[in-house]
Amino acid sequence: MTNIISMTTMCADVFVESGKMLAGGEALNFAANACKFPDVKVSIIGAIGDDDCGREVLRSIEGKPVDISDIHIIKGGKTASNHIYLTEKGDRYFMENSWDGGVDETFSMSESDRKAVCGSDIVYMTCYCNSYKDVVSLKDRSDFKLAVDFDVRRDFDEIEKLLPDIDFFFISGSEDILPVFEKWSEKYDCIFNVTLAENGSVTYHKGRKHSCKAVPVSEVIDTTGCGDSYHAAFLCSYAAEGDIQKAMACGSASASETLSHIGGFEY
């Protein structure tokens, strides 16, 4: 059994055009997809408020095998929210005021959370997570693997300083950034995965390149949570079999399914 912890963002995704509100956020999207895999125990560490959005987060994973014992429910707190806009092709975009961090922005790990991290096999988070440095500091006392999503960051000089602590590196982009990761894979003992939207994905490990095509969909409904679902499937597959190519194929299939509906997962 692989013990995976997903951190920390849980929020309400508000789809502006339709007015629909769904639970989302990287930690929640990841956990809801990872829990589909056998031999995986997935839990979430993070904070929500005791408001309607927080209750929607909890409702979204009712009945799913996700451990919620480390979700902090802040009395009188405001759950994070994100206002999402969609193009005619289903690609999401945001306005400057789309994001409201709520209690997620002020969350800090408890001692119980730190113990849970140290007892895990894999910790998944984004590079923007407030608990990032806290989690990295725990690697000295435990052997968990750290998986980090760098989204669309391009400050590669700063990013490289973080690589000694990272085991799985995820980023979204285009083929022009691939040489960076090919070079890094020869220098750092890390698996570097680059998702390329409709052009599939590429992974570098120890200088070797692995490529995988995207799984086509008849219609792209919404790209929200696509990366999270890919990362969840990739990590769960790799933890089970240690095969990069299979993990990429699994990630592509999961992302394709996510493209077919509104929101990062169905509930």
Give each language-model segment a name:
Residues 3-4, 15-82, 88-89:
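Substrate-binding N-lobe of the ribokinase-like
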